[in-house]
Every structure is written in C-alpha cells, then in structure tokens.
From Swiss-Prot:
Gene Ontology molecular function, alphabetical: rRNA binding; structural constituent of ribosome
The keyword Nucleus is assigned to this record: yes
A GO-annotated cellular component: ribonucleoprotein complex
Keywords: Cytoplasm, Nucleus, Ribonucleoprotein, Ribosomal protein, RNA-binding, rRNA-binding
Keyword Phosphoprotein belongs to the record: no
Annotated compartments: Nucleus; Cytoplasm
Entries under Pfam families matching the protein: Ribosomal_L5, Ribosomal_L5_C
Function: Component of the ribosome, a large ribonucleoprotein complex responsible for the synthesis of proteins in the cell. The small ribosomal subunit (SSU) binds messenger RNAs (mRNAs) and translates the encoded message by selecting cognate aminoacyl-transfer RNA (tRNA) molecules. The large subunit (LSU) contains the ribosomal catalytic site termed the peptidyl transferase center (PTC), which catalyzes the formation of peptide bonds, thereby polymerizing the amino acids delivered by tRNAs into a polypeptide chain.
GO biological process, one term: translation
Entry protein name: Large ribosomal subunit protein uL5
InterPro entries the UniProt entry points to: Ribosomal_uL5, Ribosomal_uL5_C, Ribosomal_uL5_CS, Ribosomal_uL5_dom_sf, Ribosomal_uL5_N
Family: Belongs to the universal ribosomal protein uL5 family.
PANTHER family on file: 60S RIBOSOMAL PROTEIN L11-RELATED (PTHR11994)
Amino acid sequence: MVAESKAANPMREIVVKKLCINICVGESGDRLTRASKVLEQLCEQTPVLSRARLTVRTFGIRRNEKIAVHCTVRGKKAEELLEKGLKVKEFELKSYNFSDTGSFGFGIDEHIDLGIKYDPSTGIYGMDFYVVLGRRGERVAHRKRKCSRVGHSHHVTKEEAMKWFEKVHDGIIFQAKKKKKMIRRRRR
C-alpha cells in the first residue's frame, strides 16, 4: 500500500536535471577552437572554455591554460542529446557508470556518430556525457529565500537511477567485475 502511493506521487518521478557535455582537448589553440565549434553545432548554444587546475609537465599543460570546452544543456534538448548519445552506446552501460548520488556518465569516441557531418578541417573529437538526475521539488535547497533541506528519502540513489535508465530508455546495465583488493604485506 505504501509503495503504491509512493509510486503514484508525481513529485517522486525522476527527471533529467541537466546534461553536461565535455570535450577535453588537452591543449589550447586551434584544436580547442575547432572542438568548441563542434560542441556549438551539437548543443546549439555557446560552450564554455575550461582551464587546467594544475601544471602537468609530462603532458605539457600549464596551470590556468584553456584545455577543454564544455556545455550544460537542460530541458527537452538535454533529453534529445542524451537519446543520441545512448544510441551510440547502444543503450548499454556498466554499473560503475552510475554514482551514489544518482548521476551517471559515459563517453563516446567520435562526434560524427551523433549525426554531425564529418568535416576534414575540423577533425574527429570524442566527448563525455554527464547526466544529473533528480526529483521535482529540489529547488527548495537552492533558492535564495526560505532555503531548506531536501529529505533523505527524496534523494536519488544509485539503484533508483539504474532502474530509471532500464525503464525509460530500455537500457541494459552490465555488472562490472569486482576489483581484487591487493593485500599489502609488511616487510620485517
């Protein structure tokens, strides 16, 4: 009885809050501007350049150098782009793609699989998709006036996100192989 009433509540429905698409080029310059054009073509909005947090000498990256481009999409456009991205992955994800907070992410190798025409001057770029799931009513935690907390039962869990993916997108989730823990022996 309680489970049925929880399922019928429209506030309990899981929705896509936002979709973040990221292309990390690893260097600034011409390749980064071409990647931003690809992302602008895909999302139909202007992307934002991301900067490196640390200097990594082996990769030739300096701190605060522009190395990536990302775009945050919400609403119907986010659901359309998510559908295109999942088609490339054939609606198959692994269990470790899902986080404990109910979000999930995956990557694709070539942007031309999403339906964008190949341009030899642009090249081919891979990208990461990050999907943030939530429920209606979570605005109370983020608003400026009369801010309050969202209850623990209203948060999206990993299991709920996986069930949502299987139900809404008819997706398949593979169980990831468990990593063996290394036993460290003390030297005497």
